Amino acid sequence: MLHDSLGCVALWREFPAELARATGRDVIAYDRAGFGRSAPAQAPLPADFIAAEARDSLPALQRGFGFAGFVALGHSVGGAMAAACADAQPEHCEALVTISAQAFVEARTLEGIRAAREAFARPDQFERLARHHGERARWVLDAWIDTWLDPAFAGWTLDATLARVRCPALVLHGEHDQYGSPRHPARIVEGLAGPARMMLLPGCAHVPHREAKPAVLQALHGFLGAPAR
């Protein structure tokens, strides 16, 4: 499980355990480098930070946990990273699941980030972030805001990655996601080279696995079915 730009294992809450029960699969959720309880990052995010997660972290997880095949699931930017994992290891990726993933830089995305920047300027809101990231909180927040608002990032898209992903995919998105319109899941489904299903969740914003958890778990149960043994 690949978390979002401000996320960590703790912020998935009970979802990983519930996902394991719903699908009968082992679930691995981890803090990306610089987030949660991982070691603090020593530098800004690299320009290729999405591809780097598939290139560097995925093999480390495979070595550490002793697995090869996997289903890649990610939330928000973690969804883009999950797609990168599917692209990087097509021989090992059984399926792809994206939740509220961005496929390009949209005005709504930037507006949502600017609004969040204002909100986190308040000490009480920043303290909520620090509760989960500790001394890493400032780096976590700046990495998200500075990357997405950087004009050099404005032309980023997931298109090239999607075109190489052939495994089955489930693309979940909240109808009222403040960080991305329904154009994102539509573009993901259209761009994937393999079979894909889009599910737009009514009444949901950016965190469907919290806002519409029963529907999300049911969809994942139906999509993943019994694990291969």
Feature roles, as predicted:
Residues 80-88, 92-125:
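Flexible "cap/lid" loop of the alpha/beta hydrolase fold
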Residues 23-70:
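Active-site loop/oxyanion-hole signature of alpha/beta-hydrolase fold enzymes
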Residues 176-180:
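Acidic catalytic loop of the alpha/beta-hydrolase fold
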Residues 204-217:
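Catalytic histidine-centered segment of alpha/beta-hydrolase-like enzymes
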Residues 167, 181-190:
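Short alpha-helix in the alpha/beta-hydrolase fold that links the catalytic acid
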Residues 165, 171-173:
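Short beta-strand/loop motif that positions the catalytic acidic residue
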Residues 4-14, 27:
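Serine-hydrolase catalytic-loop signature spanning alpha/beta hydrolases and amidase-signature enzymes
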Residues 190-206:
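Catalytic histidine neighborhood in serine/cysteine hydrolases
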